[in-house]
């Protein structure tokens, strides 16, 4: 869990561009100086920083040569703020200092005075302290904007000013890193909020409906202008909607609502919202994209989905719910079950224990009034488990440390009520926040057994309720003394904790490096391995199979040795966020680890960031566009990545369900061959990834990383694909006929098409 919780500086708008013809700015992305360590005197304008090193602020300090450095560091820059900046502004009352994103915590000083902390303005005469780094929330992905009255005496107009930035980094990348730092005056356009996703779009009567709010956030200015909305099909360019409203007047704190309705799209569409200010001569433009459904409606007749192989170790509890879609009620049958297993014919849940090793071929059947479906299921009883990537839900990306038992139970029931478990979704995993906080006592009982906090009064009962639904139960800890969120972890209590997990019915353990980095400051490869060996040995001694998820962000090329320490999956990077930049960097970076994925061992590029996420009590719709979400799910499935839903399942909408219940896409992830797709083509903004499948066919995705729709012709042989095969569009579950030597596709910006070639 990179940097614990990060607090999202989230706005309900996407791709905002404010344009003011005469607005001037001072670029701050050059001439910064840097030093490691901490001394509050560094904030003083007269401090001699001649011995400091120059540093770029468009990359973390690790990328600038300060590898593996965590803790305090300072940045300083000297800049003349010209009076004409104020004189030429439409509004002349406030100066804005934007420092981009800072990893993790910051205090910002102007001419020796503290003006801001972690993205919030500091009251005048605030005394700096060290509490700014003591919270459980990191701000590494939040932009830092600080403002002062233009009449503030701390600003030296037409003179040299010193900006000093005190940074504290927990771990991983640190410092200022976005390269877009600047000083500007606040404009009237900064007070207009175009809230286009405050209420998620809805599909009704074969139409898509959206509500847009215009809001004046100022306390003293009236906003006047013209508001226009335009929607086009991103593939064809067809105009889907066009409207202009003139003579809009928004008084301070006033808002107005606009409704948009278009025919339910079956392709990507772009909506542009534009507000033209009458007096300021500026505009605000916001763009977003409409969700569109590609997954066909499930049939009423039975269909068996999910993995065709499952595994357990000899004499360990076995649990498998037959994943079948179709109308209920439904009955189930399993032919040739191994000795020790039993099927509940009404629920489709298989339980028991098998003592003898073997590969057991079982015919599973599902029946309702519309028909019968059957498929072979291989039950592997042996030394290896987790033969297909885990599919489930994890509490972190939505609830963070605000998770509680009620939220977990609700999520488990939604698996059943929304039909997720009918498509193979299995695990219900609690992340950080179930333990006693590190600053409270007692953390353990007199015998050293870990204690749960008041949010989880009965973990065994919770596990039993999850198992009763045919689902599996996961939990979280760290090899250090504390978890990333500052809760009690497993250091020097590994065997006790493993026994506790087993007694609660735990099926999955995420084991997060976190505070173990304070024990091993500069770990060697053997030190990277050590804590995972210790917990692996503890888990093996229990009477349950517990999937072992290593979470240490890819350090030491974990994919090369994760299997050796007993890992079934291992994180390959830091935490993902719901941004295109994060998705692109993490997802398309899974290249060098490709050879190491196989049944029982999976590269984990982190959880899914579709639906409503938020890393705490305040949630928002993902910032990924619909096309980016299609890319997200497609790439993860091609990569044979673990699929862990990270959103609030109680807010599942039709579009997100469409992403999570396409059985032909999920089948790529759950293919028993366990092959991770290879990147075979990089052609400008186009990438092609190809995956070998167990039936001898190949699946491939054509991804467009560019900003515009791409019309692309793929030479099949150059991509390692055989011409003349049967082509199938997997998202639309539609046969496309035989191929020639190439195929031509239109791929929307940040989007994908996924095919199977047989």
Regions found by a protein language model. Give the residues of each.
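Carbohydrate-binding surface patches
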Residues: 75, 223, 630, 636-639, ...
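Glycan-recognition surfaces
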Residues: 493-496, 544-648
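An acidic-aromatic loop/edge-strand motif
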Residues: 24, 28-31, 36-39, 52, ...
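Solvent-exposed, low-complexity, repeat-rich "mucin-like" stalks and linkers
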Residues: 303-327
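Strand-loop-strand motifs at the edges of beta-sheets in extracellular beta-sandwich domains
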Residues: 257-261, 340-356
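Aromatic-lined carbohydrate-binding/catalytic grooves of carbohydrate-active enzymes
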Residues: 125, 389, 397, 411-524
């Amino acid at each position: 869990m990179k940097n614990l919780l990060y607090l999202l500086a989230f706005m309900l708008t996407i791709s905002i561009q404010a344009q003011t013809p005469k607005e001037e700015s001072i670029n701050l992305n050059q001439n910064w100086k840097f030093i490691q360590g901490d001394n509050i005197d560094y904030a003083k304008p007269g401090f001699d920083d001649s011995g400091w090193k120059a540093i770029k602020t468009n990359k973390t300090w690790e990328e600038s040569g300060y590898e593996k450095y965590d803790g305090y560091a300072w940045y300083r820059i000297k800049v003349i703020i010209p009076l004409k900046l104020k004189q030429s502004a439409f509004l002349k009352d406030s100066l804005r200092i934007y420092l981009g994103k800072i990893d993790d915590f910051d205090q910002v000083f102007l001419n020796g005075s503290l003006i801001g902390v972690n993205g919030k303005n500091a009251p005048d005469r605030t005394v700096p302290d060290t509490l700014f780094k003591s919270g459980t929330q990191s701000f590494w992905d939040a932009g830092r904007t600080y403002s002062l009255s233009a009449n503030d005496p701390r600003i030296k107009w037409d003179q040299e000013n010193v900006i000093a930035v005190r940074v504290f980094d927990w771990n991983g990348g640190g410092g200022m890193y976005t390269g877009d730092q600047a000083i500007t005056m606040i404009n009237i356009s900064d007070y207009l909020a175009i809230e286009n996703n405050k209420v998620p779009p809805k599909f009704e009567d074969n139409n898509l409906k959206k509500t847009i709010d215009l809001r004046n956030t100022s306390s003293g200015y009236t906003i006047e202008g013209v508001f226009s909305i335009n929607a086009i099909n991103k593939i064809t360019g067809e105009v889907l909607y066009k409207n202009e409203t003139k003579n809009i007047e928004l008084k301070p704190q006033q808002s107005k609502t606009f409704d948009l309705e278009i025919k339910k799209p079956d392709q990507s569409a772009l909506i542009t919202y534009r507000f033209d200010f009458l007096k300021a001569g500026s505009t605000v433009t916001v763009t977003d994209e409409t969700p569109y459904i590609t997954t066909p409606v499930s049939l009423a007749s039975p269909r068996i989905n999910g993995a065709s192989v499952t595994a357990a170790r000899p004499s360990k509890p076995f649990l498998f719910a037959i994943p079948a879609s179709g109308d209920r009620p439904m009955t189930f049958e399993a032919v040739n079950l191994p000795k020790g297993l039993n099927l509940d014919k009404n629920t489709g849940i298989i339980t028991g224990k098998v003592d003898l090793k073997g590969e057991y071929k079982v015919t599973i059947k599902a029946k309702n009034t519309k028909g019968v479906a059957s498929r072979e299921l291989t039950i592997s009883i042996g030394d290896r488990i987790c033969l297909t990537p885990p599919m489930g839900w994890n509490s972190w990306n939505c609830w963070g440390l605000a998770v509680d038992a009620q939220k977990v139970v609700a999520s488990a029931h939604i698996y059943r009520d929304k039909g997720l478990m009918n498509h193979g979704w299995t695990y219900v995993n609690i992340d950080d926040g179930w333990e006693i906080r590190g600053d409270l006592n007692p953390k353990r009982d007199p015998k050293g057994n870990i204690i749960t906090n008041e949010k989880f009064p009965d973990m065994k009962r919770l596990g039993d309720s999850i198992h009763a639904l045919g689902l599996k139960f996961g939990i979280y800890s760290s090899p250090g003394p504390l978890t990333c969120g500052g809760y009690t972890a497993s250091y020097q209590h590994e065997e006790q904790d493993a026994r506790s997990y087993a007694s609660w019915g735990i099926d999955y353990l995420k084991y997060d490096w976190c505070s173990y980095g304070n024990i091993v400051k500069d770990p060697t490869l053997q030190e990277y391995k050590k804590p995972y060996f210790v917990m692996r040995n503890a888990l093996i001694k229990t009477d349950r199979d517990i999937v072992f998820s290593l979470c240490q962000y890819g350090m030491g090329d974990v994919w090369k040795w994760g299997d050796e320490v007993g890992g079934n999956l291992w994180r390959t990077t830091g935490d993902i966020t719901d941004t295109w930049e994060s998705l692109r960097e993490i997802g398309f970076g899974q290249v060098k680890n490709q050879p190491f994925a196989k049944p029982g061992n999976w590269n984990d590029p982190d959880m899914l960031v579709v639906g409503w996420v938020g890393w705490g009590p305040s949630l928002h719709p993902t910032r990924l566009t619909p096309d980016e979400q299609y890319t997200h799910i497609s790439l993860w499935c091609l990569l044979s990545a673990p699929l862990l839903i990270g959103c609030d399942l109680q807010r599942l909408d039709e579009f997100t369900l469409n992403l999570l219940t396409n059985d032909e896409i999920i089948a790529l992830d759950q293919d028993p061959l366990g092959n991770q797709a290879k990147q075979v083509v990089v052609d400008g903004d186009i990438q092609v990834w190809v995956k070998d499948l167990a039936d001898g066919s190949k699946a491939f995705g054509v991804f467009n990383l560019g900003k515009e729709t791409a019309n692309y012709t793929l030479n099949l042989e150059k991509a390692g694909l055989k011409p003349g095969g049967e082509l199938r569009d997997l998202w639309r579950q539609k046969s496309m006929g035989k191929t020639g030597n190439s195929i031509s596709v239109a791929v929307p910006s940040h989007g994908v098409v996924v095919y199977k070639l047989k």
